[in-house]
A protein has these predicted regions:
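His/Asp/Glu-enriched, well-ordered alpha-helical/loop segment
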Residues: 1-86
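C-terminal cap of metal-dependent C-N hydrolases
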Residues: 7-23, 76-138
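Peripheral (often C-terminal) accessory segments that flank ATP-dependent C-N-forming ligase machineries
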Residues: 139-143
Length: 143
C-alpha cells in the first residue's frame, strides 16, 4: 500500500485524489545524473555506453525501439543534452516530486542535464520544466 492515513500527520493534510499519493523511494529525476557521475565521471565509462543502457536497451525491452531509444531517421527526436562539467548537489528542495525523500539526497557530482527534448520540442531547460502539461503521448508496443 502506497498510502496510509498515518501519513496525514506527516503531510499535514488529507489526500483526496489518488494522483496526489506518493510512495516508494523516488529516483527518476536524479537517476541519469547519478548514473552519469558514477559511470562516466568516476569510472571513465563512455557516454555512448550509458546512452545504450538508459535509452536503446530499455526501448528494445519495452518493444518501442523503432520510434524511441535512438537518434536515427524515423525515430522521435527525444534528446537529453548534458553539460559534463556542471556540478550538482541533490537536496530535498531540488526534488520536483511530491515526496521529498530520495536515496540520492546529499549526493554531489558532475554532469547535469541542461536540456530535454520530446519529439523535437524543448520540455526542460536548466532544471526547469518549460513545456505545458500534456506534451507526452502514449506509445504502443511496436509489433
Amino acid at each position: 500500500c502506497s498510502y496510509d492515513e498515518k501519513f496525514n500527520e506527516i503531510l499535514g493534510n488529507k489526500i483526496e485524489n489518488v494522483f496526489d499519493v506518493w510512495g516508494g523511494c523516488s529516483g527518476i529525476q536524479s537517476g541519469f545524473q547519478v548514473t552519469f557521475n558514477e559511470g562516466c565521471v568516476k569510472r571513465n565509462v563512455c557516454p555512448t555506453v550509458l546512452a545504450n543502457a538508459m535509452s536503446v536497451q530499455p526501448a528494445k525491452a519495452f518493444g518501442i525501439y523503432g520510434r524511441k531509444g535512438d537518434i536515427k531517421p524515423g525515430f522521435d527526436a527525444d534528446l537529453l543534452i548534458v553539460d559534463p562539467e556542471k556540478e550538482w548537489e541533490i537536496t530535498s528542495d531540488s526534488l520536483l516530486y511530491v515526496n521529498k525523500i530520495s536515496a540520492f539526497v546529499g549526493m554531489k557530482g558532475k554532469g547535469l542535464p541542461i536540456m530535454t527534448m520530446i519529439r523535437g520540442n524543448v520540455v526542460a531547460e536548466d532544471g526547469k520544466i518549460v513545456a505545458e502539461k500534456g506534451v507526452g503521448t502514449f506509445i504502443k508496443k511496436i509489433k
